[in-house]
Amino acid sequence: MLVKTFGAAVQGINATIVTIEVNVSQGIRFLHVGLPDNAVKESHERIASALEFCGFKLPRKQIVINMAPADIRKEGSAYDLSLAIGILAGGETLQFEELDKYVIMGELSLDGGLQPIKGVLPIAIKAREEGFKGFILPKQNAREAAVVNNLDVYGVENIKEVIDFFNGDSTLEPTIVNTRDEFFSNINLSDIDFSDVKGQENVKRALEVAAAGGHNIIMVGPPGAGKSMLAKRIPSILPPLSLQEALETTKIHSVAGNIDNNTSLISQRPFRSPHHTISDVALVGGGAFPQPGEISLAHNGVLFLDELPEFKRTVLEVMRQPLEDRKICISRAKFSIEYPASFMLVASMNPCPCGYYNHPDRDCVCGPGIVQKYLSRISGPLLDRIDIHIEIIPVPFEKMAEMRESELSELVRNRVIKARNIQEQRFKDIDGVYCNAQMTSKQQRTFAPTDKASSELLKNAMQRLNLSARAYDRIIKVARTIADLDDSENIQSNHIAEAINYRNLDREGWAG
């Protein structure tokens, strides 16, 4: 008897419905076709054990399973439940009239229990698009899938619940999540604030500019100056995620398997801080069976690279293209996968190996040329892609007690949101551009023209600092953001001057 069940394969952050055809007929063979990987092929033993534990047996007949479309590779053990239900229906142990209305996914334990799977949100979205009535999956994943409206999501703990459901012996209660309530209830939850950091007003201003325009930034300063503390507070001044951004971010983390049982939607901007020993693949994504890397997990949020020169040169260089394209394409012999990677890069570094070059109170012990050699670990092309360079001078301990209360993140965020709203209006007719950092050179000429005084000031800076053409573009973009924060329609010379001031690492003699 031939029956069909439905599962899904996840490629990138999107899913494709997989039709699982099960034919139970006379014979003794078990055949599995349709480009399954080893984990799928090994499902036979898991299914047999799970069914036996729950009081059922595999049909003592020939079982042929085809998974279509055949050109898409089916990976992992997430098809176990769908395969098992198809086999039981083919052996006439289970009623199959309703099977075509549901997508069924789940990894089986040997005792019939279900283990959580990855990529649930993209699968649920695809199931709704294809007109399925419901989605049956492990209970641990139910809240994540229930974010999708107009789709009945049934979380189950074991295969017997599914069998009884299709045989009409019991009912399943759908998991219900109010997506908007879930989103808005968690959107502003944060236990850290900009006001936690005493002093460093010039650095906070640079971070405000970076947040307002979506600019990449690098902070250079000695140990203990507050680089990491400031970086961790950047999400608190960024605009809240929109619902669309939250769904896109959650899809990426769903594919990576980072959504826990109690989470349905990621409502806050991601903050990723990988260790400097990270590999190329872990940073940008990939592998034999591609997974999103840190740059994609930081999509719509912040990627913080602490001690930037300590990262391997190859790791930093593979990041150059995603910084420009805001996506990463992973190509293999038979397929390619694209992951979004639109993030704000925040980097920090010591000015030299000992960390005390230019320190007001400590002497640097690094010899001549060592400082420049240390800085040269960061290539020019990568540094050009970082819009803002800011030097941090540590605040003396005795002055901290005298300082007034610092500004709250909420106040800074309000200014950032106002500037972002200006940019949203500016780029409303341009696809893929939402903030000043994303402008192309052509768009700069339209949206960020400079007057004669500003052009002359910038020309002198270009000659004196020997800046590249890319650095020129970065200065214009940053100046446009500063003008937006000032609610100025045109870029003034003071905006250009401040933007030039944020190119510390371009200055001749900065490192000796």
Positions of the model-derived regions?
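Short beta-strand elements
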Residues: 18-24, 283, 387-390
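P-loop NTPase nucleotide-binding/switch module
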Residues: 170-209, 213, 240-295
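Residues immediately C-terminal
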Residues: 110, 303-304, 310-311
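Peripheral, non-AAA+ core regions of ATP-driven protein-machinery
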Residues: 1-218, 222-228, 331, 471-472, ...
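Walker A/P-loop
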Residues: 219-260, 325
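Basic, amphipathic alpha-helical bundle interface domains used for macromolecular binding and assembly
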Residues: 39-44, 59, 66-76, 289-290, ...
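Walker B catalytic acidic pair
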Residues: 300, 306-307, 318
